[in-house]
Design a protein with these regions (language model features):
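Active-site loop/oxyanion-hole signature of alpha/beta-hydrolase fold enzymes
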Residues: 41-42, 54-99, 253-254, 262
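Catalytic active-site module of serine/aspartate enzymes centered on a nucleophile-bearing elbow/loop
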Residues: 237-270
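Structural signature of beta-strand start/N-cap positions in the alpha/beta core
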Residues: 26, 52, 90-93, 114-117, ...
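Conserved HGGG/HGGXW glycine-rich cap/lid loop of the alpha/beta-hydrolase fold
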Residues: 14-63
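Conserved loop-alpha-helix segment in the C-terminal half of the alpha/beta-hydrolase fold
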Residues: 207-248
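Flexible "cap/lid" loop of the alpha/beta hydrolase fold
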Residues: 105-110, 116-147
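N-terminal cap/lid segment of alpha/beta-hydrolase-fold proteins
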Residues: 1-15
Length: 270
């Protein structure tokens, strides 16, 4: 297996970092906000045993540049196509986690000839009030406090749910990289939700809806999502398959990579 390497894609709006490794049919991984391609650190080596696996940092997050304007989900979808064109990939499967799932679905809707199979992981739905909370929170972004209290605030934000200090540290590092600017991918996903219900109904490719049994827990506690708003995806894509991973959380890609990889590999083999 080829080692997983890091590289940059040059675009008119700045550079996009991506990780790539393995050989075979391509699989693109798109992370949630405000994380980065580090979200797939545990998963990539497993999937790269049989595939060419690519994970990109969404513009404005991780080690990708900040975009010069507010990006929409459609803009993020165009960056996916730009990366595929750069790598000579005509058709690929995609796994998108939460924010990345919205972008993955838009790629499949806007460029159906470029998508083989689609995996939508923990792609939650929102009502109008939740959308407003998300937009307000991420438009402001994370603020730097003079006394450094923002550092402890980010550490405490998810430590009880992530479970491992090392993983929480990685999440906080991703948080710190997007301080001082709006978190555009999260804003784009929240703004896109009503459109997503119509856009995702256009999908024809084989689609897996993968969710963690406990993925909603922290979102419900934060007032960002409710269980009763989570049926839209199956309705929008009636031909989709659905798998719920027992014990899976919002960070199950890091916490349970072997279990997630088995589900992904089994679906892609069909």
């Amino acid at each position: 297996m080829k080692p997983i390497k890091r590289a940059f894609l040059d675009t008119e709006d700045g550079q996009i970092l991506y990780r790539i490794g393995g050989e075979g049919e391509p699989l693109l991984l798109l992370h949630m906000a405000p994380r980065s391609s580090d979200e797939f650190r545990e998963l990539m080596p497993i999937l790269a045993q049989n595939r060419c696996v690519i994970a990109m940092d969404l513009m404005g997050l991780g080690d990708s540049d900040k975009p010069p304007r507010e990006y929409s989900v459609a803009d993020y979808a165009k960056t996916v196509i730009a990366l595929w064109d750069e790598l000579g990939i005509q058709k690929s499967s995609i796994l998108g986690n939460l924010t990345g799932g919205y972008i993955a679905g838009e790629v499949a809707a806007a460029y159906p000839e470029r998508v083989d199979k689609l995996i939508l992981c923990n792609v939650v739905g929102f009502d109008a009030q939740e959308q407003e909370i998300i937009l307000n929170r991420y438009t402001e972004g994370f603020k730097i406090e003079e006394d450094g209290s923002h550092l402890m605030a980010r550490w405490l934000a998810r430590v009880n749910d992530v479970g491992k200090e090392e993983l929480n540290h990685r999440c906080v590092v991703d948080d710190l990289k997007c301080f001082g600017s709006p978190i555009y991918p999260a804003m784009a996903a929240a703004s896109y939700f009503l459109d997503a219900q119509a856009r995702f109904s256009l999908l024809k490719c084989p689609t897996l809806i993968l969710s963690g049994e406990k993925a909603l827990d922290i979102l419900e506690k934060a007032g960002l999502a409710k269980a009763e708003n989570q049926f839209w995806l199956s309705k929008a894509i009636p031909h989709s398959q659905k798998v719920e991973l027992p014990g899976g959380t919002l960070w199950m890609l890091n916490q349970m990579p072997e279990e997630v990889a088995k589900i992904v590999v089994d679906f892609l083999r069909i």
